[in-house]
């Protein structure tokens, strides 16, 4: 009798855990399906609205395409190499890679992949992606493509945001995802 009660209690516990997991799964699915409404009081609210635009930099060996959404490189093509179809070798494009830099502020956090940057200071070898803040400050992602090289200098520079960042925070998070393509036959 006692053993049957223990077995029943065990089964009841398993069933209760399964029900809780099912409820949590449903709640997560509902939350994921709800539209995200940007915080209109955010210092970067205006930058959270926009449309994607592209800018290209190139030298003799490399062509890079930048997106203002996230202020990132969204396509890289090697000009001196060809793929199996004898086309210029594309290392990655928008479907293959994502990069987001995270910045921890005093009252809010910024994820670069959720923001629309303003493209400024464009030359044949440089571009600045600027994230404008409502207070007149900005966060710049500065890219410089070196001549005849595969090297890209990347600088993050903040201006007028001293009240946004806590003085003790000296780091940023990097979320970089890359899907490597098969480039060789076989």
Predicted segments — roles?
Residues 1-25, 133:
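Subset of Sec-pathway N-terminal targeting signals
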Residues 19-52:
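Short, Gly/Pro- and small/polar-rich lid/capping loops
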């Amino acid at each position: 009798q006692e053993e049957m009660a223990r077995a029943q209690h065990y089964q009841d516990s398993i069933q209760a855990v399964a029900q809780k997991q099912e409820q949590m799964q449903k709640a997560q699915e509902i939350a994921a399906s709800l539209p995200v409404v940007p915080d209109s009081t955010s210092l970067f609210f205006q930058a959270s609205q926009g449309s994607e635009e592209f800018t290209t930099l190139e030298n003799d060996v490399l062509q890079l395409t930048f997106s203002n959404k996230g202020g990132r490189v969204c396509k890289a093509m090697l000009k001196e190499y060809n793929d199996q179809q004898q086309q210029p070798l594309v290392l990655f494009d928008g479907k293959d890679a994502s990069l987001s830099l995270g910045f921890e502020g005093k009252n809010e956090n910024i994820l670069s992949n959720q923001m629309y940057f303003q493209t400024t200071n464009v030359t044949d070898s440089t571009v600045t992606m600027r994230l404008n803040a409502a207070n007149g400050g900005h966060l710049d992602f500065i890219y410089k493509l070196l001549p005849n090289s595969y090297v890209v200098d990347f600088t993050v520079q903040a201006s007028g945001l001293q009240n946004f960042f806590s003085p003790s925070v000296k780091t940023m998070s990097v979320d970089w995802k890359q899907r490597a393509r098969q480039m060789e036959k076989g």
